[in-house]
């Protein structure tokens, strides 16, 4: 869904996207990797995952590259909040990749892409970075499962001497309300066939969020998912939805709302889903006028596309205003006429 990312990626400025020439580098999958390298990457990832699960931010900091260890507060916050979600989970390293960018020149701002064909299939996993410093990197995925919720802890690792240091941490849930990404993908397909494209759009996006290890990682399957989402999109969303391409929905009278994002959000207890709406707005004087306008925005969206009522107990509306924090309204779906 345009304009939204739940991924807590913390590596960096070095991943910012720019429109410049692309440089291809070398990727080695775990099936073709030297056993000692594969073991070293997996061991480091498991140590980091165990430290995150234990809430041991000091151990994570000690294993982090100096650039991010010196400004560790965002990573420490991610460690603290993620560790709370992993109680009762067992950690297992499921995938490691070796990404060799050692031939890049220092200061090179071109894009760097790694194409990783998977053994005995026609599928591949791809990585795309920009302004990636020269070096040898590893990407490791640690699955956390067995507790109340499944999570994925992905780590970008940089080889330093004979060891590895963390250069990026990307935790995110693998399920929403007890359902995994494949479930949401299947549900989206069914709703396209059932002529409910708006609900399908949100479900495709949820599937993408749950299945994608990090924002800079793609795969043959994820490309297929996004192609299906585009093919089944309502005409109003054919160009996506974002600040640049808002969805305009009429309210009462001459009122209209410019929505910039439609998303799912799991409730804190993991037991239900919220429908999350963002729209562009100008500041109003006082809390009550903002609340009334936010409620009107939610009502306009649900009235225009009533299928979005399905599966959601609450609508959370963000009125994004220039130069200040958004106003936020949480509205039970039962209160929306």
Sequence positions of predicted segments:
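Short, low-complexity N-terminal intrinsically disordered segments enriched in polar/charged residues
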Residues: 24-54, 168-183
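Short solvent-exposed beta->alpha transition segments
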Residues: 27-36, 42-46, 58-124, 208-238
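Short beta-strand edge/turn micro-motifs at domain boundaries
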Residues: 25, 113, 134-178, 256-286, ...
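Bacterial N-terminal signal peptides
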Residues: 9-21
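Short helix-adjacent coil turns
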Residues: 48-60, 188, 194-198
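Acidic, serine/threonine- and glycine-rich low-complexity intrinsically disordered segments
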Residues: 173-255
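Intrinsically disordered, low-complexity, charge-biased linker/tail regions
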Residues: 102-105, 115, 236-277
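N-terminal secretory signal peptides that target proteins for export/translocation
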Residues: 1-7
């Amino acid at each position: 869904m345009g304009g939204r990312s739940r991924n807590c990626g913390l590596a960096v400025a070095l991943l910012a996207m720019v429109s410049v020439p692309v440089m291809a580098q070398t990727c080695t999958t775990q099936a073709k990797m030297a056993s000692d390298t594969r073991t070293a990457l997996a061991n480091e990832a498991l140590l980091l995952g165990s430290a995150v699960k234990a809430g041991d931010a000091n151990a994570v900091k000690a294993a982090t590259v100096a650039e991010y260890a010196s400004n560790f507060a965002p990573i420490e916050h991610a460690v603290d909040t993620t560790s709370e979600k992993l109680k009762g989970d067992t950690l297992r390293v499921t995938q490691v990749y070796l990404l060799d960018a050692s031939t890049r020149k220092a200061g090179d701002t071109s894009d760097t892409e790694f194409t990783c064909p998977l053994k005995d299939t026609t599928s591949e996993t791809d990585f795309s970075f920009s302004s990636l410093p020269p070096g040898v990197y590893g990407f490791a995925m640690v699955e956390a499962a067995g507790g109340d919720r499944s999570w994925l802890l992905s780590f970008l690792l940089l080889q330093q001497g004979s060891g590895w240091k963390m250069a990026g941490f990307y935790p995110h849930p693998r399920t929403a309300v007890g359902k995994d990404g494949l479930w949401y993908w299947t549900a989206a397909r069914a709703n396209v066939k059932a002529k409910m494209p708006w609900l399908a759009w949100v479900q495709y996006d949820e599937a993408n969020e749950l299945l994608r290890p990090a924002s800079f990682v793609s795969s043959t399957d994820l490309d297929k998912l996004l192609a299906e989402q585009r093919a089944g999109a309502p005409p109003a969303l054919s160009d996506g939805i974002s600040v640049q391409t808002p969805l305009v929905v009429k309210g009462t009278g001459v009122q209209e709302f410019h929505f910039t994002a439609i998303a799912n959000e799991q409730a804190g207890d993991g037991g239900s889903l919220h429908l999350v709406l963002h729209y562009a707005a100008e500041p109003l004087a006082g809390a009550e006028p903002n609340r009334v306008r936010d409620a009107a925005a939610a009502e306009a969206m649900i009235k225009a596309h009533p299928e979005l009522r399905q599966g959601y107990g609450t609508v959370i509306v963000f009125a994004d205003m220039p130069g200040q924090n958004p106003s936020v309204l949480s509205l039970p779906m039962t209160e929306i006429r």
